[in-house]
């Protein structure tokens, strides 16, 4: 573990500078869960997520209960909680079980706040986007938790380029839900199985009854596209 006096402890130094507990949470994710945050905190990832948060703040709409799909380490959740956005709670779903403890650690303050944030290991194809029931393993009680039911108002997916059966997934979202989507045109990455050429193609693949925002962000190697609206 890096000592607080060590100048290599960037998270510790930022905590002292800003008094923002998020930096301590990031530090704990690295120290206690061996989290590699180099990609999650890359300029491309952070600029894309900051763009999303900024546009939501400009729209000034209530997000209510948020389902963050393919949420990874839920750095976006941390940014949303620190924003001006009106949020009741966030549930972050990812099929990779290694994400759970890291995401919960990064958002530890909201986890402790009656689970205002909670990460769940689950395939986003298996979620009921109308009224979803979920459980997690409780180490404290050595058993599964009692079932919890959440009804999402907002569905966010910033990893649409990774969703192989995107049409099938999108069809699961009920009409009227607020949807925030990001994809890109970075076709060179093998894991990017659902890239789009531009915003026009993206809008065709994800039709909405009311579009609140359509835009693109120029990044060094690719363009990222974003749609915000009601399905």
Stretches found by the model and what they are:
Residues 1-64, 101-154:
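S-adenosyl-L-methionine
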Residues 73-87:
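Conserved SAM-binding loop of SAM-dependent methyltransferases across substrates and taxa
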Residues 64, 152-153, 177:
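Conserved acidic residues
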Residues 88-95:
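Conserved SAM-binding motif I beta-strand of class I
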Residues 98:
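Conserved Rossmann-like nucleotide-cofactor binding loop
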Residues 61-75:
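Conserved class I S-adenosyl-L-methionine
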Residues 164-231:
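C-terminal substrate-binding/active-site "lid" region of AdoMet-derived donor-dependent transferases
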